[in-house]
């Protein structure tokens, strides 16, 4: 039995899905509100649903290339059918041979298998070089070998049926559907008509349709006619081969109509030829499609910036290109792991990055917290369309209203102008004429001004200028340092040695001691001198008193 690719989700991805599902239970779906941001030059261009896809599931589609005509009309179309049959064999035999070579390259020895596999691939490669992608595709082809063998076992019954769509389940390890685009044409044209058709008309109709289908076959395969390991068949190619009957297989594999158009655009539905039988003209294709998990609460919002007018010149907001919001949490979304379609993102993993408080506040509607960069030049397109209206920087270009006639002026201090059908029905911007059908309601903020403190330098030329100023400042500082060094060089280094410093300290202490002793001695001598003066003064006074007393006597 053929091996079946595992659809088990790896543990890290399962954890991511569980976290996202928990958030979806407690938080409503959110997206960035672009109404307060538009006048600040930040435009939300659209939202996309975020999905996770993992290991693919597979099914087989058996294309019945040769239709069965009604018995009474076989002779009529024998000539074009025979020519078509020969052309098919010539066209697809190299493909069948290449498939067989790759599938037969499997051997029991481990080392020989890789060598034979690469050799089988190189056999169908013009330059003799097998890329890793081709080796991987060939390995998948080998894995489908048993399923292809089981289909060939039922080839006679599949070729004999007149049904345009026929589910084949007997002995197959995966879902297989036999379809016949040409059989559908035969059934519609001949089996269900009541009018008689002449032989010539039957032959002409069959011949034209067979030639058209041959053209589609050559368009579908291209270089893969010689090597099935070159490229995968796209979903568009599969539809060309199987017609509308392709929907039957996709529905059986669980792809809903609401998801089908998005998956077709994603390129995740592909096919690989696994067999070709020239006897019955059956072409087997293994169809691969992803298992998709929807994150109902998560939306990816795409942001574009418009050059706005500031007092420091033209600038654009510094915001991420893609953000996602869950509840009150806004983070930057890395889309390098995702495949984008018009409405959806299909990611193998969800990777987000936290934003600074300033950017978070800006995207939450606080435009005064938005930061701008002087990176937009005058040649940048100064306008952007959104929902039938226009956001334009009318200071960078002339906003001329054709109907009603007039010039739309942008007031001083305004970052951009919001123009809708209420103010102008037909608008001319730099030679481009636009008919406006949208309208900015009252919830859109207008007349927003960008402060000088919100504009920073990030452009290459501006940064070079600022770096030049910094270099000048550094040069001036170096000159001052050189001058200081010259002054220091004049100082005697010997006087600043350790031993000299110790000597200076000791001498200073001795000097202080002698100074203190001298001060004490001086104080003592002064005290003694004053005492002597007092004694002499007393003796003088006493002698004078005695002399006065003697005189009186």
UniProtKB/Swiss-Prot annotation:
Residues 117-141 are annotated as: Fusion peptide. Residues 522-553 are cytoplasmic. The record marks 116-117 as: Cleavage. It comes from the Viruses. Disulfide bonds join 338-347, 362-370, 394-399, 401-424. GO terms for biological process: fusion of virus membrane with host plasma membrane; symbiont entry into host cell. This is Fusion glycoprotein F0.
């Amino acid at each position: 039995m053929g091996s079946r690719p595992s659809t088990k989700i790896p543990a890290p991805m399962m954890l991511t899905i569980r976290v996202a599902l928990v958030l979806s239970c407690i938080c409503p779906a959110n997206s960035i509100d672009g109404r307060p941001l538009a006048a600040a030059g930040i435009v939300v261009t659209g939202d996309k649903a975020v999905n996770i896809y993992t290991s693919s599931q597979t099914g087989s589609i058996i294309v019945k290339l040769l239709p069965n005509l009604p018995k009474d009309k076989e002779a009529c179309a024998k000539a074009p059918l025979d020519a078509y049959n020969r052309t098919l064999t010539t066209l697809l035999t190299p493909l069948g041979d290449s498939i067989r070579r790759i599938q037969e390259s499997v051997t029991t020895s481990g080392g020989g298998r890789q060598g034979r596999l690469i050799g089988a691939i190189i056999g169908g490669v013009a330059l003799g070089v097998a890329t890793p992608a081709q080796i991987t595709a060939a390995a998948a082809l080998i894995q489908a070998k048993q399923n292809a063998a089981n289909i060939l076992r039922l080839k006679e019954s599949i070729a004999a049926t007149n049904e345009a769509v026929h589910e084949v389940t007997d002995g197959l390890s995966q879902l297989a559907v036999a379809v016949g685009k040409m059989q559908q044409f035969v059934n519609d044209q001949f089996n269900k008509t009541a009018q008689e058709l002449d032989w010539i008309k039957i032959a002409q109709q069959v011949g034209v349709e067979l030639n058209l289908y041959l053209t589609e076959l050559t368009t579908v395969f291209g270089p893969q006619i010689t090597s099935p390991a070159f490229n995968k068949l796209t979903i568009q190619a599969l539809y060309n081969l199987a017609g509308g009957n392709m929907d039957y297989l996709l529905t059986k594999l669980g792809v809903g109509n609401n998801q089908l158009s998005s998956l077709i655009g994603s390129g995740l539905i592909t096919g690989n030829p696994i067999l070709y039988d020239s006897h019955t003209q059956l072409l087997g294709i293994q169809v691969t499609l992803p298992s998709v998990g929807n994150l109902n609460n998560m939306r990816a919002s795409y942001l574009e910036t418009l050059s706005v007018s500031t007092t420091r010149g033209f600038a654009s907001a510094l915001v991420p290109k893609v953000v996602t919001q869950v509840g009150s949490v806004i983070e930057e979304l890395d889309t390098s792991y995702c495949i984008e379609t018009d409405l959806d993102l299909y990611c193998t993993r969800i990777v987000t990055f936290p934003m600074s408080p300033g950017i978070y506040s800006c995207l939450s509607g606080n435009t005064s917290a938005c930061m701008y960069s002087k990176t937009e030049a005058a040649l940048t397109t100064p306008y952007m369309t959104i929902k039938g209206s226009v956001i334009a920087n009318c200071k960078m270009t002339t906003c001329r209203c054709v109907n009603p006639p007039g010039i739309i002026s942008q007031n001083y201090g305004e970052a951009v102008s919001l123009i809708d059908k209420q103010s102008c029905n037909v608008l001319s911007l730099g030679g481009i004429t636009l008919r406006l059908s949208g309208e900015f309601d009252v919830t859109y903020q207008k007349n927003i001004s960008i402060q000088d403190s919100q504009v920073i330098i990030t452009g290459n030329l501006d940064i070079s200028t600022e770096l030049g100023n910094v270099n000048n400042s550094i040069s001036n500082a170096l000159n001052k340092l050189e001058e200081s060094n010259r002054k220091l060089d004049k100082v005697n280094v010997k006087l600043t040695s350790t031993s000299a410093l110790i000597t200076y300290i000791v001498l200073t202490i001795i000097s202080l001691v002698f100074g203190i002793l001298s001060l004490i001695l001086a104080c003592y001598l002064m005290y003694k001198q004053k005492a002597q003066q007092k004694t002499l003064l007393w003796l003088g006074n006493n002698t004078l008193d005695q002399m006065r007393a003697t005189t009186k006597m």
